[in-house]
A protein has these predicted regions:
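Short, solvent-exposed polar/charged micro-motifs at secondary-structure junctions
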Residues: 16-19, 193-197, 306-308
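Conserved beta-strand scaffold positions in the cores of enzyme catalytic domains, especially
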Residues: 6, 183-185, 292-295
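Compositionally biased, intrinsically disordered or flexible polar/acidic segments
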Residues: 1-161, 167-170, 329, 338
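Short, structured coil segments at secondary-structure junctions
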Residues: 92-94, 179, 252, 291
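Residue-level detector of flexible, active-site-proximal loop/helix-junction positions
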Residues: 104, 155, 190, 263, ...
Length: 368
């Protein structure tokens, strides 16, 4: 029997079959669910018909935790307010964007279903937005969902909350996919195609991935580094390591997809973007043809985007912040490699565009 959890939020009576959650329901290990900080939660009861719709919690950048076994889950969120419009953003641990500013008119109630991947036996859902609401939450195991595994570096990874607004494009990809697909982001900061394998990270994916899943592979930023644990030669060892990812996926009937490295933000004097990856990009393109692996040329797509924005405006995509602009960077930050959240959203959209253009089927069917 499929395990499921059903929660009714607010201060009215609980709906049949649902567990009641109020603004006083704090997380306790023995309980296994609750808000991690109830000071950021209020509750209202509009005293209208329908026990799920009449009352709600208002989570002002608040997180709700449910202890669950590792695996894939479909979550369905009910949102609405009888008398006020609402607008809610939902992220899953850590910082994976599931939906953004979901607007619901006053008197309406909507359900939004999304898929999540849990690795640490805890599902943490963070609600924010201009006027957030949560009326109901259903969590159901989804063992038959398609997994989209990501292997890559810091430009792809789920960046930690204490680095906000740092974000990898893999964090933003879930909002672009229907609930049939779960994004399993195994990308890790500082890794090259070589060190990712030598640390056992590819093996961890191979142990999980199944037939008809996908493995997206983006390396190159750190393969250029000269230290022995990470460096690969672009025409030889770089290709050899990338082949291991492709072979690992194909061995179980999964589908590998190569992604060229997203560009850094460095411009020539003539306004053209400087290519800091050089032969690594061409090697990925060559390998795609040699092994008949679908290719998303994110390097070319990001080049066009950055050049269109120009040297100054493109800063808005990257971690460029004045002193005091970002809470975790009081002295400011100037980073031409890593994205802030809005930039990662734009790059994830380019990846989704690449899925369509490369006719990666049936994955392309599940794009929103």
């Amino acid at each position: 029997m499929t395990k499921a959890w059903k929660f009714d939020f607010g201060i009215g009576d609980a709906d049949v079959g649902y567990t009641k959650i109020t603004d006083k329901t704090d997380y306790l290990p023995e309980r296994g669910y609750g808000f991690t900080d109830i000071s950021r939660v209020t509750a209202r009861d509009r005293k209208q018909p329908d026990s799920l719709k009449r009352d709600m919690c208002i989570p002002a950048d608040a997180s709700f935790r449910v202890d669950v076994p590792n695996g894939n889950y479909m979550i369905t969120v009910g949102m609405g307010d009888w008398i006020l419009p609402s607008c809610t953003t939902l992220k899953a641990n850590p910082g994976r964007l599931l939906f953004h500013n979901k607007a619901v008119t006053a008197g309406q109630y909507v359900k939004e279903s999304v898929a999540v991947y849990v690795r640490d036996e805890a599902l943490i859902l963070t609600f924010s937005g201009p006027v957030p609401r949560i009326n109901a939450l259903e969590i159901e195991a989804a063992p038959n969902a398609i997994n989209l595994y990501l292997a890559g570096d810091s430009t792809v990874t789920d960046q930690p909350d204490n680095g906000f607004p740092y974000a990898g494009w893999g964090q933003m990809l879930p909002r672009l996919l229907k609930h049939d697909v779960v994004v399993a982001n195994h990308a890790e900061s500082g890794r090259s195609s070589k060190s990712f394998i030598n640390e056992g990270r590819l093996e961890a994916i191979v142990q999980e991935i199944k037939a008809n899943d996908y493995l997206f592979i983006q390396f190159g930023h750190n393969d250029q580094k000269t230290d022995e644990p990470r460096y690969t030669e672009p025409h030889t060892t770089y290709k050899e390591y990338l082949r291991q990812y492709i072979d690992g996926a194909r061995a179980v009937g999964a589908h590998p997809v190569l992604v060229t490295s997203v560009h850094r933000r460095f411009f020539e004097k003539n306004g053209q973007l400087k290519d800091t990856h050089g032969p690594y990009l061409q090697s990925v393109r060559e390998l795609s043809g040699e092994l008949e692996v679908p290719l998303i040329d994110l390097a070319e797509k990001s080049k066009r985007l950055f050049e269109e924005l120009g040297e100054e405006e493109s800063k808005s995509l990257f971690m460029w912040g004045a002193p005091g602009e970002f809470a975790f960077f009081p002295n400011g930050v100037e980073d031409n490699t890593h994205f802030q959240e809005q930039g990662a959203i734009r790059i994830a959209a380019l990846v989704a565009e690449g899925i369509r253009e490369a006719s990666i089927w049936p994955l392309s069917m599940y794009l929103r």
